[in-house]
Regions:
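N-terminal pre-domain segments of enzymes
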Residues: 20-84, 382-391
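Non-catalytic accessory segments flanking enzyme active sites
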Residues: 52-123
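Short beta-strand element of the alpha/beta-hydrolase
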Residues: 118-121, 128-138
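Cap/lid segment of the alpha/beta-hydrolase catalytic domain
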Residues: 136-219, 252-255, 259-261
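Primarily recognizes the serine-hydrolase "nucleophile elbow" in alpha/beta-hydrolase
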Residues: 201-266, 292
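Mobile cap/lid helix-loop segments that gate and shape the active-site cleft of serine hydrolases
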Residues: 248-303, 324, 328-332, 340-345
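Conserved strand-to-loop "acid loop" that flanks and positions the catalytic carboxylate
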Residues: 308-326
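C-terminal catalytic histidine-bearing segment of alpha/beta-hydrolase fold enzymes
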Residues: 333-334, 338-391
Length: 391
């Protein structure tokens, strides 16, 4: 009798998970579904408890209906303690136009100042519009061959139009970037909050113009980038729910790699003490340096989890120790539990393979990327279950 009851309960659980999965969207038509929720209390860093393990991303979540609020709380924590505020924008503050057939121009006006974003859409030679779109943060480092014979348009988000910081070229300092002209009170922001804001404004422009004018299918937008731009892609994908697929390539510390795990590493990795602080709030280093990292109320697995229920693929390269891929793997496995909890584990995966240059995706990793692109940008019935490759 007990055995029969266990079988019935197992079948019932599987049936409920399957039914729930069918009702969970692949993407949304708004930037942030959690706007209706008030931010949680944000204690002073000295009042935060010590949490040695990776914090529970599913805290207070009993089912998918609870996820939007939990995701909103994570969103607020990351902004408050980590990267700074990504301000919301009213629709009337954005004016978009197509200049010719391929150039998207988006003007964003705030507080009497206007910031202009420009990007060229490169349309595919196959298929018919509206097309799926892959946006590269700074550039698309994925091999061109992955897009050549697929009906996917591509474009680049030129991040310097928002915050022109660069490790290698002349740039402005905090408070002097184009973004800061619109929001001078947010001059202490890290670049990742501002870059995420900028990419969202490009999507606003596409949404405003509509698919007839842009030839873009708004339900099939992806974002990708590598290294510092891999971090950027992850923040952009996490903070804008109109993005159906996020592919973060070799994002390193401050991207997918958990700060706690990087801190515990015996190797020279990018940890919370050794990263580029133009990207983050200076207060993050002041408040969470050294063992104080255990008082950080979230970790990077929760940034990854913010992408849920949409699709996320993390790509690593263990040959580059600085990237802290062991910490990324720990983060990926913890984040995966969120998708798994809702019966949609096939929407999240990772591939960590060495033997190649930085940001040079080898052919051995092409199948994972192709599977995610085909399913989540093209809507093909590609199997993305158990894409969890690691060396």
């Amino acid at each position: 009798m007990i055995r029969i009851l266990c079988i019935v309960l197992t079948l019932l659980t599987a049936t409920m998970a399957s039914a729930q999965k069918k009702n969970i969207p692949l993407v949304y038509n708004v930037e942030n579904t959690g706007m209706r929720f008030a931010p949680p209390a944000m204690p002073h860093p000295t009042q935060l408890p010590v949490i040695r393990q990776l914090p529970n991303a599913l805290e207070g979540v009993n089912g998918f209906d609870d996820w939007s609020k939990r995701r909103s709380n994570i969103c607020h924590m990351i902004q408050h303690y980590g990267i700074g505020t990504k301000p919301s924008v009213e629709s009337g503050q954005v004016v978009a136009r197509m200049q010719g057939d391929t150039a998207l121009v988006v003007n964003v006006s705030v507080n009497g100042h206007t910031l202009t974003l420009r990007s060229t859409i490169r349309y595919p030679k196959v298929g018919k519009p509206p097309y799926a779109l892959m946006i590269g943060t700074s550039m698309i480092s994925l091999p061109k061959q992955l897009f050549d014979n697929r009906p996917i348009a591509t474009m680049t988000f030129h991040e310097f139009q928002v915050n022109d910081y660069s490790q290698w070229r002349k740039h402005h300092e905090r408070g002097e970037h184009p973004f800061d002209q619109l929001y001078p009170h947010l001059k202490d922001n890290g670049a990742y909050s501002e870059w995420a804001w900028g990419l969202s404004r490009l999507i606003d422009g596409l949404q405003q113009l509509g698919s007839t004018r842009t030839k873009i299918d708004m339900s099939r937008i992806g974002v990708t980038g590598c290294s510092y731009a891999g971090k950027m892609a992850l923040y952009c994908g996490a903070f804008d729910e109109r993005i159906a697929l996020t592919i973060a390539q070799e994002p390193g510390g401050g991207g997918a790699a958990a700060w706690r795990k990087s801190h515990e590493s015996k190797e020279k990795v990018e940890d919370i003490d050794k990263t580029d602080y133009h990207w983050f709030l200076e207060s993050q280093r002041e408040n969470f340096h050294g063992d104080s990292v255990y008082q950080l109320p979230y970790d990077q697995h929760e940034l990854c989890a913010m992408v849920c229920p949409r699709a996320l693929l993390l790509i690593g390269n263990p040959d580059y120790v600085w990237l802290s891929d062991a910490a990324m793997l720990a983060s990926a496995k913890e984040a995966y539990k969120v998708w798994e909890r809702f019966g949609i584990g096939d929407r999240m995966g990772w591939s960590i393979v060495g033997g190649h240059g930085h940001c040079q995706l080898p052919e051995s990793q092409w199948p994972e990327v192709q599977a995610f692109i085909d399913r989540f940008l093209l809507g093909l019935k590609t199997d993305t279950r158990n894409i969890q490759k690691e060396q």
